[in-house]
Amino acid sequence: MIEYFLPLLLLCVIQSGTPGPNNIMLTASGKNFGYLKTVPHMAGVVIGFLSLLIVLSLGLISIFITYPLIQTILQIAGSIYLLYLSYRIYNSYSSENNSRSKPITFLESSLFQYVNPKGVMMAITTISIYTDFKSFEFINTFIEGMIFILIAFTISNVFAVLTWTSVGVFLNNFIKSERSIKTFNGFMAILLVLTVIWINYEFYGS
């Protein structure tokens, strides 16, 4: 079991923990709104992604393979939404006496997982590799493989959302003035836009 689960967990930690749309937005939210107000956002990432894994395991992967246009549409929709979120981050502002924006809600965060290009590809890749019970002696059925995947991604996603939100909260100790806050939000928005460009470059293979 260890020989199967540890490589799976490592893969999930790497995929979940590396910079991407969710982690960039969580860092910005941690900085602008603090830990408590970012909890719904964090919970939405974890639960939304787990629900995506379950939906994909029920047959959506085969639909993507049969009808690639669906994946393309989701890719475009996700990219447009990410650009909107980058604009939203850019216009965020918070200080002790002023607030012009609201953190991402649980529902928004959960639904975003279904159009998050990085997340969808993570899920498809992991399910395709680690549910092949012909390649792994330890698992006997597709369901067993999915159980291990769900456990691994729960651990890795909880670790990732807590870590990246903590980074944002930590940065709040140094970014206090209105000018520095605007600079930070602008930088995070640019990172999100660059992520959109990179994801689409990878997707279309240009």
Residue ranges and their predicted role:
Residues 13, 17, 50-51, 87, ...:
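Hydrophobic/aromatic residues within the transmembrane alpha-helices of Major Facilitator Superfamily
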Residues 109, 113-126:
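Selected transmembrane alpha-helices and immediately adjacent juxtamembrane segments
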Residues 91-105:
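Flexible cytoplasmic inter-helical loops of multi-pass small-molecule transporters
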